[in-house]
Regions:
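Non-catalytic helical/linker scaffolds that mediate oligomerization, partner binding
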Residues: 1-321
Length: 321
């Protein structure tokens, strides 16, 4: 069983990363949705220092931007209150034009893995929305348009620049968002080969219905299938997420394909030192379903108890095995 923690301000010191590796953690994920690989050099250097100190070949996965939809950069967090009107696009919250063009009146718009929700009222160069579920919106948070598919390139210009820097920063794997076809993975492999990085492991994220349903067509083109429950839950609806995870697990088992489960495994531990019983059962059952890897995100990136979260993840996985 492989286990990963997401890098962030809460854990990115060489001594702390060394402690996590000594506990048995396999490696780390670096989320590039909010930043660039070059800007994260202090963090990747901390990983390399931890590798040397622990004597363990810790994996370093970079999670690419890819075709996923995201809010632009905000000067400061924006509170959204249920019932209020907000504008997306010119004169309002920064959203890319192709996203705005895909929105029709009545469209539900989910933000930050569904934590907040809007309903589109009128559409044009800008989209006027009503907040249906409030919260505090931060820069670069995810946008989901349930039922809408946008055609975007597998790799952005920034992704290609990040791959240019990968060899010099100890990267061992890439995680490709919103995989829906074999062609997208072939594009990733070609980009890696052009940089002499064909040895890097490719994690392919399933984040919508199309990616889930087309899994048999592209499964063998990646190294590890990733059940990315944040956007997958937003796109399918939470009630359909358990069936999707079970089905993906069964397909991977039959094909002998390794798969990873990620998102809110121990979410409570972002703020509390122990998980809930439901979280313990969730992780335990993921192992019983055949998961070959588990990954923490906010629990270690920004949580108050990163060491305890990793310890719980390791203990639950070992107990299940």
């Amino acid at each position: 069983m492989k286990t990963y923690a997401t890098l962030g301000p809460a854990c990115c010191r060489a001594d702390l990363l060394t402690e996590l590796l000594d506990m048995g953690l396999t490696g780390f994920r670096l989320n590039l949705s909010h930043t660039t690989l070059a800007a994260c050099r202090p963090w990747t250097e901390a990983v390399q220092q931890a590798r040397a100190a622990s004597g363990r070949p810790a994996e370093l996965i970079v999670d690419m931007r890819g075709p996923e939809l995201r809010m632009g950069t905000l000067p400061q967090p924006v509170p959204l209150t249920a019932g209020e009107t907000v504008i997306l696009g010119p004169g309002g919250l920064p959203v890319e034009p192709d996203i705005l063009a895909a929105v029709a009146p009545g469209q539900e718009i989910l933000l930050d893995d569904g934590l907040m929700a809007l309903r589109a009222e009128s559409c044009g160069r800008a989209v006027t929305c009503t907040v249906t579920r409030g919260g505090v919106l931060e820069s670069r948070k995810s946008i989901t348009l349930p039922g809408v598919e946008l055609c975007r390139p597998a790799l952005t210009e920034q992704d290609l620049l990040d791959l240019d820097a990968a060899a010099g920063q100890g990267v061992t794997a890439v995680m490709q968002p919103f995989v829906r076809s074999r062609h997208e993975l072939e594009q990733v492999r070609t980009a890696l080969a052009r940089r002499g990085l064909e040895h890097l492991t490719i994690f392919a994220k399933i984040e919508d219905r199309q990616g889930w349903q087309s899994l048999p067509q592209w499964m063998d083109a990646c190294d590890v299938v990733t059940v990315a429950r944040g956007d997958l839950g937003s796109n399918l609806g939470l009630l359909h997420l358990p069936a999707a995870q079970k089905d993906i697990a069964a397909r991977c088992r039959r094909a002998g394909k390794p798969f990873l489960v990620v998102t809110q495994l121990l979410h409570t531990m972002t703020e509390h030192p122990t998980p809930t019983r439901a979280e313990v059962l969730d992780v335990y059952n993921a192992v019983l379903d055949g998961a070959s890897a588990l990954m923490l995100t906010g629990e270690t990136a920004r949580g108050r108890y990163p060491v305890q979260a990793v310890r719980w993840l390791l203990d639950i996985a070992r107990q299940a095995e």
